[in-house]
Amino acid sequence: IKVGLYSITFLGLWYRGKELSLKQMIKKAKKYGYDGIEIDGKRPHGNPNDWPTRRCKELRSIADGEGIDIYSVAANNDFSSPICEHWQSQIVYVRELIRMAADLGARTLRVFLAWRGVTRHPQIAKYSLARKIWNYTHTLTTDEEDWDRCREGLLESARYAGDYGVTLALQNHAPIIRDYKDMLRMIHEVNSPHLKACLDLPIMRDKSPENIHRAARQVGPLQVLSHYGGEFERAADGSIKNNIGNEPYVHFIRAMKEIGYNGYIGYELCHPLPVVDGKTVGIEFAEKNAQMAAEFMHGLLKSYG
């Protein structure tokens, strides 16, 4: 298993301060000991309108020169929207990200079934407004209708992915998806060789050892991508502690080993961050956590992977 850094960590959304450019991200990933990067599919990092083929190939050349892989791109798509124009624009967005991923040499595109979005107020991101809008637009639709729209979006997107030689990695991420069983149900219903799984531990509701191993066995060879997250602190004995607990990750890594997974597990810092003295923490908080996250995961893989 290889360790990656997801660019949402340095997108400038959740901390005070500017984003890192993708060139800076590549250097940061190398400095911290990551094997590769995953590029978030929105500005200022990975909006496909900003990344024509020529520019993608230039970035890939820079990454290759640093020994850093560009292993994935991440879509922030919402295939659940009942608004025709919104739903159709999401198909175009994902299709263009598939093209961009292929031009970057990335093997996977992370996709959602649905996504509420984020807003800036004025700099720090928030989920609350986007969540209210999403919830309101779904008040007159049924769960079955939402599911069907998501399936239709993935069916069309999987065809585009096949054209470009890219694999869509469906994440077990809410809304619509409640747990890994929903993720697997959708993958089986779409029934495309170009749609696989992205099972992530942090967003599993049940993190018991039994459920972690059960989920891994059921996902099996469909697993092509994974993420980890959280905030880290160094204990007095020098060990690194994760805020959701280290033990679930031990079981997750063991479970991934048991199913023969050898792809990437990428770190992401993607949630509202602490407020200190009345201000949200700055980029140094993201840097500290990204550095410790790499050390944390490499240590787990050495011991249990």
How would you label these PLM feature ranges?
Residues 1-33, 105, 177-305:
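Histidine-acidic metal/acid-base catalytic patches
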Residues 8, 75-76, 112-116, 268-270:
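Short loop/turn segments at strand-loop or loop-helix junctions that form parts
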Residues 23-26, 56, 60-69, 80-196, ...:
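Active-site acidic/histidine proton-transfer and metal-coordination neighborhood
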Residues 35-44:
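A short beta-strand-loop structural module common to alpha/beta enzyme folds
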Residues 38, 72, 110, 169, ...:
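Conserved beta-strand positions in the central sheet of alpha/beta enzyme cores
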Residues 42, 171-173, 270:
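A short gly/proline-enriched turn/hairpin at secondary-structure junctions
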Residues 45-47, 77-81, 116-118, 174-177, ...:
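Short, small-residue-enriched loops and turns at beta-alpha junctions
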